[in-house]
Regions:
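Conserved functional hotspots at enzyme active or ligand-binding sites that engage polyanionic ligands
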Residues: 1-111
Length: 111
């Protein structure tokens, strides 16, 4: 697989993990640009879960799409997409990507 693009939905291993972090092989949304991903070999990703809890940092994926569930925008991780055997699933809708980036930005910006 070549470097994933921002907005790509990929399969990726989140193991090892610690505490309340998501674990196992699961879908994720890539939020970093492909230029970064290809040069560094890492990608900033948010895991996706099918267990909707109604938390404010969950972003729902549209029903009927290739991946069901919610993107966990508050669980941003930097992972080696090659060693974790990333596989492209599809691209997320632009509205989902924009909302996730907005929430990640809110977490990282000054109060």
């Amino acid at each position: 697989m070549r470097a994933p693009e921002r907005g790509a939905l990929i399969w990726l291993s989140f193991t090892p993990q610690s505490g309340r972090e998501q674990a196992g092989r699961r879908p994720a949304l890539v939020v970093s640009p492909s230029t970064y991903n290809s040069k560094v070999g890492l990608a900033l990703v948010c895991p996706i879960t099918s267990r909707v809890k109604g938390y404010p940092f969950e972003v729902a994926l549209p029903e009927g799409g290739p991946v069901q569930g919610v993107v966990l925008a508050d669980q941003l991780r930097s992972l080696d997409w090659r060693s974790r055997e990333a596989e492209l699933i599809a691209n997320a809708p632009i509205a989902v990507v924009e909302r996730v980036l907005q929430l990640v930005g809110a977490l990282l910006s000054s109060p």
